[in-house]
Amino acid sequence: MKPRISVLTLGVADLEQSLAFYRDGLGLPTKGIVGREFEHGAVAFFELSGGMKLAIWAQDDLVHDTGLAKTPISPTSFTVGHNVARREEVDAVMAQARRAGAEIVKAPQDTFYGGYAGYFRDPNGHLWEVVWNPANIPADA
C-alpha cells in the first residue's frame, strides 16, 4: 500500500462547538461547515501542514455512515501530535488550548528523549500531544 493518508477525521458530539474550538480557539484555518445540504453530510475541514487536513464530523453521522455502534470516545486509543519548532511554543499552544476550553491532562514537562511535551483533551475528549522534539523539528518551521 502506498501511503496516501490525507485526512484525519474526529467524531464530535457538537459540530458547532467543535468548529469554534478549533477555528476560534486554536486558530486552525477552515472554510467552516460544508455539506449541510446532505443528510449526515455536514463536516468541517481544517488545513494542516503538508497538505494534510483535520476533519470534524458529528459522531452520530459517522455512526450512520459506517453502520458501527456508537461508543464513547477513548482518549487512550489515539492521540493527535502537534510538533512545534521551539520548546517555548509547547507552553504557548497548551495555554491557547486551555483558554479555548481544553482540559490539560499533563502539563508540559521534559521528556525521556530530550524533548518537552504536554497533553490536552479537546471538548470531545480527543487527546492531543503538543511536543517539541529537538531530533524532529518540523520541516516548515
Region roles according to the model:
Residues W57, T66-L68, V130, D140-A141:
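Short, charged, solvent-exposed linker or helix-capping segments at domain edges/interfaces
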Residues T9-V63:
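Core segments of cupin and vicinal oxygen chelate
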Residues M1-L19, K31, E37, T79-H82, ...:
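N-terminal beta-strand motif that seeds the catalytic metal site of vicinal oxygen chelate
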Residues K53-A55, T79, L127:
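Short hydrophobic-acidic sequence motifs that mark active-site Asp/Glu residues
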Residues F21-R23, T71-S74, A100:
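A short alpha-helix capping/helix-coil boundary motif
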Residues M1, R4-D14, A44-L48, G67-A141:
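Vicinal oxygen chelate
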